[in-house]
Swiss-Prot record:
This is Trichodiene synthase. It catalyses: (2E,6E)-farnesyl diphosphate = trichodiene + diphosphate. Pathway: Sesquiterpene biosynthesis; trichothecene biosynthesis. The gene is TRI5. Keywords: Lyase. InterPro entries: Isoprenoid_synthase_dom_sf, TRI5_ascomyc, Trichodiene_synth. GO terms for molecular function: trichodiene synthase activity. Changing N279D: In strain: NRRL 28065. Pfam families: TRI5. Trichothecenes are sesquiterpenoid toxins that act by inhibiting protein biosynthesis. TS is a member of the terpene cyclase group of enzymes. It catalyzes the isomerization and cyclization of farnesyl pyro-phosphate to form trichodiene, the first cyclic intermediate in the biosynthetic pathway for trichothecenes. It serves to branch trichothecene biosynthesis from the isoprenoid pathway. Belongs to the trichodiene synthase family.
Amino acid sequence: MENFPTEYFLNTSVRLLEYIRYRDSNYTREERIENLHYAYNKAAHHFAQPRQQQLLKVDPKRLQASLQTIVGMVVYSWAKVSKECMADLSIHYTYTLVLDDSSDDPYPAMLNYFGDLQAGREQAHPWWALVNEHFPNVLRHFGPFCSLNLIRSTMDFFEGCWIEQYNFGGFPGSDDYPQFLRRMNGLGHCVGASLWPKDLFDERKHFLEITSAVAQMENWMVWVNDLMSFYKEFDDERDQISLVKNFVTCHEITLDEALEKLTQETLHSSKQMVAVFSNKDPQVMDTIECFMHGYVTWHLCDARYRLHEIYEKVKDQDTEDAKKFCKFFEQAANVGAVAPSEWAYPPVAQLANVRAKGDVKEAQKPFLSSIELVE
């Protein structure tokens, strides 16, 4: 395995953060913790239900880590929506992360997918059965156009995860393949459409802005994720089908060239995002800016992306990019570094055990020791 290109990564990250003029002022610390705990608590009770425990069959520690990661993403990025909407989106996106981390072959359970869908029967695939049951809780927050985007994008995501089961990065010369797969599994339209709940936006009045935001968010959101997750995915056997590495294979270019290609496209997308919406409805622009800055904070602060390792590695270096990266990292940590023990309680496993014993009230008591396992 080749060495991680630390200096190159620092340079690309700094260029992105400077380009979007990163500054996260979405919450006070108290507001952030309050929203985190509200969304987490509702989602944790959802996944502690016997049906979810039986059908998902996810290792408790991994489910706990996935839930904490997604609650952070939603609360930090969807800063303008209601706490109830945050909680329902947290559940939905936790399901997607569980699927993304799965290695199960979906083929047998998908043989009669459309027949079951048409007849109104429960899906044979347990993930679809659970997601479909929860979907009404998500869609109640949105108008029909945004809802259609959420449904369609979730279906695309499932197909993208199916493709990734084959660990196929594309054939050399297949230039369209990397972006095809990334759009499929990126949830860009789902994310773009879920920024506009009907209690805040009339989708008929803002139809053009919403449509444009979905189009722009499809690329910006997934490309930023690819840049910020490049470090964690670099030497992980499960993450070798990344956009950057697929660029290397299909475009037959070097890793540095692939990373630069992604960087340039991300910067261009950021420029478009600001230029397109800067003179539109102020509420629309505010929502987009809050998402962009919160989304970056989440990546810098969440343990899943391990960017604290980069920070520790370069904090004593005297290069310009190292100093700028560390300044941005510290800026994000000042607002977004909140220990899970402050909000992610009780653990899902504890709730599930208490439910099995029939004492739900006992599950409301904080039980922090097991949380430390996934901090």
